[in-house]
Design a protein with these regions (language model features):
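Small-residue-rich loop/turn and linker elements
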Residues: 67-99, 128
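Gly/Ser/Thr-rich phosphate-binding loops and adjoining beta-strand/alpha-helix segments
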Residues: 5, 20-49, 70-82
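Alpha-helix initiation and N-capping motif
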Residues: 12, 35, 106-110
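Helical lid/core segments from catalytic subdomains that handle acyl or acyl-like groups
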Residues: 90-133
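Short alpha-helical functional segments enriched in proximate histidine and acidic residues
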Residues: 60-67
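Structural preference for long, well-ordered alpha-helical segments in enzyme cores
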Residues: 54-60
């Protein structure tokens, strides 16, 4: 679910109006992170590291309201929950875009991810499905 933000009363209206004129109205950062402990936890849980870090990342995103805002057309919307999308490599060295519905239980999420990986690996093309709105 999502809700449209009333820009006329939103305290970030001025920021939105400024940044929405940019060709890419967002910023990204990268930083090295020591993932040793996360890797060890994933292995102890017998969950692939990819699933572990993706789950923890999306769980963190969903805890921060500002990370759940999206620009849709001329509107800002706030999603109740953000799901995951990742590129999945195939044997022939091509990849496809995936959609992985977030689940708070990491074992349930692991099942969702594995099902999606298997689907992508036998589905040709870059865009392998319709993405929910």
């Amino acid at each position: 679910m999502k809700q449209k933000i009333d820009l006329s009363t939103w305290n970030r209206k001025e920021h939105f109006e400024f940044f929405c004129t940019f060709e890419e109205p967002f910023f990204g950062i990268t930083t090295p992170i020591d993932m040793t402990i996360a890797y060890e936890k994933a292995k102890a849980m017998q969950i692939p590291f990819f699933v572990y870090y993706l789950h923890k990342t999306i769980a963190a995103v969903n805890q921060v309201e500002n990370f759940r805002y999206r620009i849709e057309g001329n509107d800002v919307v706030l999603y109740d929950e953000i799901d995951a999308s990742s590129t999945i490599m195939r044997e022939d060295k091509t990849f496809g875009f995936s959609f992985m519905k977030f689940h708070s239980d990491i074992h349930e999420f692991a099942t969702i991810v594995q099902t999606e990986i298997e689907r992508i690996q036998i589905t040709p093309g870059l865009f392998t499905r319709e993405f929910p709105e």
